A protein has these predicted regions:
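Short, gly/Ser/Thr-rich active-site loops of penicillin-recognizing serine hydrolases
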Residues: 330-361
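Bacterial Sec-dependent N-terminal signal peptides
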Residues: 1-21, 355-356, 368
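Active-site helix/loop module of the DD-peptidase/beta-lactamase fold
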Residues: 105-143, 190-222
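N-terminal leader/targeting segments and the immediately adjacent pre-domain N-terminus
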Residues: 15-80, 85, 103-108, 140, ...
């Protein structure tokens, strides 16, 4: 019994010790401690290729934090440390945490029906159908509302129509998420910017503001403010010993699979290292991790045009990217671009391998994103194989039997699927047409 008690004490001590190793910058001013890549034993000859890649992909700001301290901080063009940029859907995690704070304060319960806060008739569903939708369904993208109407951002009842029973279908749908703002405003009795500022922003020294250019509510801030929020996520909702989200159960649920349809999605948060994943504007379930060259325990806030917060608890690492679209596809979730960053970042950290390390037997697309020719390689292609290209909705675009260099210059920009069937295997790869 004494040994068990001693073990519990030691584990608790080590857990607290790990938390104490994180550095937190002051709430005001520009002071922020730094570490050099040399101090960490990183391979500095990989930094310039990383920066060259980022600049070529329209990046404006890029930061890497280790143990809360800045290791890499690079701004491109006229963008500087104090420049403001939009988060796009990376801001969804801000709302996800804010809902958890409101619940901890007793203002709402995520298992309550959404109509309690949005009013009856917030959709065009029948009352029975609408009453099945809860706040949790809005957090997990399982509202069952139709995301394929062509008005996925529209929050008017006429735009919110029935597709499936709540909880039975995962679809990346902005409108139900955006309406969480009104849920929070109704529950708190405060303006969304006001409640956000007092609950998160001021407590961690962020700057920024929520603005509504249309139906969407978009957060704008500096890259360092984005890094501050990444640090809050890394420390599980606690800032320098002060709880911001004082609910460890909610945080755990936020950063773990929230349903069994898309294993790689928590509460408005993307997850890595799962057996499968889904992407916006598609009902296809892909096998493997969302970001294959990144650590399995990574979770992320990802936004359109490559707005990225990567958090890696096992390495006490935070990676931030702000900027314009890295290519012409304008994907809602930049998982391919994010993976390309990790390939180069692994070289910088002298860790060129990952759980998805490529070997000669694996089939892989060359030069992804693709311009005119879709080329792929792998030793399993030495025999006969069938190659097919699909769009993300699953529609067949073309077949090319026993041809690993396919002309795709006439395809529209966006994400596609390459399916390769050999005599022994069936492989599906996502790729992006610039």
């Amino acid at each position: 019994m004494k040994k068990i008690v001693l073990a519990i004490i030691v584990i608790g001590y080590l857990t607290n010790l790990q938390g104490q190793t994180l550095y937190f910058p002051p709430l005001t001013g520009n002071e922020w401690q730094k570490l050099t890549p040399e101090e960490l034993g990183w391979c500095t000859d990989g930094i310039e290729p990383l920066y060259t890649f980022l600049e070529g992909k329209n990046t404006k700001a890029f930061l890497v934090l280790k143990d809360g301290k800045i290791v890499l901080e690079k701004y491109f063009g006229t963008f500087v440390q104090d420049s403001i940029w939009y988060w796009a859907s990376a801001g969804k995690t801000l709302t996800g945490m804010l809902v958890g704070i409101a619940q901890k304060e007793g203002l709402l319960d995520i298992y309550e029906k959404s109509s309690k806060y949005l009013g009856e008739g917030w959709t065009s569903l029948s009352k029975d159908q609408e009453d099945l939708i809860t706040i949790r369904h809005q957090l997990t993208m399982t509202s069952g509302l139709d995301d394929g109407t062509g008005e996925a951002d529209c929050t008017l009842p006429s735009c919110l129509i029935y597709k499936a029973e709540a909880g039975t279908r995962w679809a990346y749908h902005n409108a139900p998420y955006t309406l969480l703002d009104k849920v929070i405003e109704t529950a708190s009795g405060k303006n969304y910017n006001t409640y956000f500022a007092q609950s998160i922003k001021n407590k961690i020294g962020m700057n920024g503001i929520w603005l509504k250019p249309d139906y969407n509510n978009v957060y704008y801030s500096t890259a360092r403010s984005m890094a501050r929020y990444g640090l809050l996520l890394l420390n599980k909702g606690v800032w320098n010993g002060n709880p911001v989200l004082n609910d460890s159960v909610y945080f755990k649920n936020m950063t773990n699979s929230s349903q069994n349809i898309n294993q790689s999605y928590g509460y408005l948060t993307w997850l890595n290292g799962k057996d499968s994943y889904m992407l916006p504007q598609s009902q296809i379930v892909f096998g493997g991790s969302t970001i294959k060259d990144a650590p399995d325990d990574l979770f992320a806030a990802l936004g359109k045009n490559g707005q990225i917060i990567n958090v890696v608890p096992s390495k006490n690492l935070i990676v931030i990217r702000m900027g314009n679209p890295p290519n012409q596809s304008g994907l809602f979730v930049p998982n391919v671009f994010n993976n390309d960053i990790w390939k180069l970042l692994n070289d910088v950290m002298c860790n060129s391998t990952s759980s998805a390390e490529v070997n000669e037997n694996q089939i892989r697309v060359l030069n992804n994103p693709v311009r005119d020719r879709l080329s792929f390689t792998g030793s399993t292609l030495e025999g006969y194989f069938e190659a097919s290209v699909y769009d993300v909705s699953g529609k067949l675009i073309l077949n090319a039997n026993h041809n690993n260099d396919i002309y795709v210059g006439n395809l529209a920009s966006g994400m596609y699927l390459l399916t390769i069937r050999t005599q022994t295997d069936l492989k599906t790869i996502t790729w992006v047409k610039e």
